[in-house]
């Protein structure tokens, strides 16, 4: 998998923008219809996938970049269908393995190894399972993960040459001192320079049960701060919680229960949160994969274009060390 193109500079901005009067196209559904494909490890394809997979792909003719998505703690990959569909409708192929189903989850090292098997399967196994005239560009793959899957995504990026990494409220344990293995937050700086976007939640650090689902010291801020060699963006969805990117009512009973009762959730509809997260992901990858920076730079310049409130928006361009910042007021 090839490295990213060079990042583009951004001007330094501080303060709070005026309220946007219109949304951006990345926050609404894209031009492509989508097709969902389910693969089991018993699939007749050669080689079969090492883990069960959901693939959501644009249904149209073309060549599309790939996103490897890693689910959150003990959640079903089926619980993210709205986000997958939104992203795929903008011209990306989402590959989402079911790494495990158990509660408690396996060791983080075992989870990482399972994700690595799927990453290694992509170049040989993905294309033959796509619709006719739909081609996957596996030379430029982004890895994205939610919750504990975010930790796995960053750990996988230390091992493989992904084109970009995206963390959706990533979590590395219950605290900095009780982190998951491999303990990547023990590093002062991650040993990669690929572009990064981290999206955190304002309520992820608020406990609902025994502990917060995205506790301070092991959450999105820690991941962002360690990407010192990367062009990197950070967004915080102020009024939403750790599970608010999931479908409203996940079909898997376990995921439904975890989604509704385990973490502190926001009081508003999840739909704007999902559209915001999906839109940021699309805008980020359009910028760094295709050189189409307009939407991503507009969000950084004026976060009120997003369908939800975003605080602590920050972008650091590694090539120039210029910073775009919107501080919380």
Curated annotation (Swiss-Prot):
SUPFAM superfamilies: alpha/beta-Hydrolases (SSF53474)
Subcellular localization: Plastid, Chloroplast
Reported temperature dependence: Optimum temperature is 45 degrees Celsius. Active from 30 to 60 degrees Celsius.
Active site: 147 (nucleophile), 169 (charge relay system), 242 (charge relay system)
Reaction it catalyzes: a chlorophyll + H2O = a chlorophyllide + phytol + H(+)
Coiled coil: none
Family to which this protein belongs: Belongs to the AB hydrolase superfamily. Lipase family.
Function: Catalyzes the hydrolysis of ester bond in chlorophyll to yield chlorophyllide and phytol.
Protein name per UniProt: Chlorophyllase-1, chloroplastic
Gene this protein is translated from: CHLASE1
